[in-house]
Amino acid sequence: MLSLSSYVLNLVGSILCLIGCLFIIGHFFWIPLLRTSLSRIIIYPTFILLLYDMVSFPSFISKTADLYIERSTIICNFQEAIIQYLILSNFIWSVCISVNLLYLCFSPNKNLKKNELLYHLCSWGIPLIVVVITKIPNMISDNGNQCRFKSPNYIKFYLETILFIAFMLFNFIVAFITIKHIISGNLRESETTTTSVLFVNEKKITTKKIVWRLLLYPSILSICYIMTLVLSIYQFSTESYGSGGAYANSINNKRNDKNTESGNSNNNNNSYIEILLYISKAIFLLQGFFNALVYLRSSKLRDRYKKITIFRKIFWRDEADYQSINDGFN
């Protein structure tokens, strides 16, 4: 039985993720300038995270606490495959953002829009290949009991673990390099040239603000996934857990060892791991909320709200008072 606090935390994380993703998506389509900004690429991982939240949410209505629906083997495996695909795609999009940051640091004349087709091919194609490869052992060893498998899926564990660690390290290294270039002022000003010194300086300032936001998105994802990665490694390394499902063998062990002393010990350990896994899922979902907070710092977004009187009076009162004084003189 999961503790009430971990269950509530997971539910709160899911709701905040939903709010954050809808906030980004809504403003992306509402404000045209956001669709032409360097930070427009964040819309793709936002859609992915929203879909992940929706697909994983039915675990709340399951009779037994688990990451996956337990009503049928087919539905459970399909849900698990979608979740695996979405997490991989989310990470690859974060790598694409990091690659853009490297271009901003080292290739000032590069047109980043030309890379988007390649980004789409990698972000949607590579996860599909990984899911197909890692699901084959599950099809062979499936015991027909709702995502419970007879043996650990070594291919899935090692392949995903290596990929996730590599993606996270790459994102952190790029963030460090980008921060170094921001401090030194070695960033691309614009895709076009100009003879106006003032215009160039404005472009530099704007680019720096966008880059600061861009480098936060991959870092937020990597930080939010660290706990899940560590627990997945621990879970796989213990004899009580396999990689076929998040809590697969733990629940079976509870049923088999219910009346034994060793069973009680296993139950306590498994329950503790289940709580941590639920908490790690909640932390991962908070990525959507944190991304929305970063997105809120967009000058294009804030400029649009400044044009709305009620928001200008509440959040930019000084500017509203200054405008009123000018209107009075005029």
From Swiss-Prot:
Cited Pfam families: Dicty_CAR
Q: Which residues lie on this side of the membrane: Extracellular?
A: 1-10, 62-85, 138-156, 235-274
The molecular function terms of the Gene Ontology recorded here are: G protein-coupled receptor activity
Subcellular location(s): the record lists: Membrane
Major location category of this protein: membrane
What InterPro entries does the annotation carry?
GPCR_2-like_7TM (IPR017981), GPCR_2_secretin-like (IPR000832)
| Family annotation (PROSITE patterns) | G_PROTEIN_RECEP_F2_4 (PS50261)
Kindly list the GO CC terms recorded for this protein.
Answer: plasma membrane
Q: Does the keyword Transcription regulation apply?
A: no
Biological processes, Gene Ontology terms: adenylate cyclase-activating G protein-coupled receptor signaling pathway; cell surface receptor signaling pathway
The segments annotated as topological domain Cytoplasmic are 32-40, 107-116, 178-213, 296-330
Q: How does it sit in the membrane?
A: Multi-pass membrane protein
Keywords from the UniProt entry: G-protein coupled receptor, Glycoprotein, Membrane, Receptor, Transducer, Transmembrane, Transmembrane helix
Q: What is the designated name of this protein?
A: Cyclic AMP receptor-like protein E
Gene name per UniProt? crlE
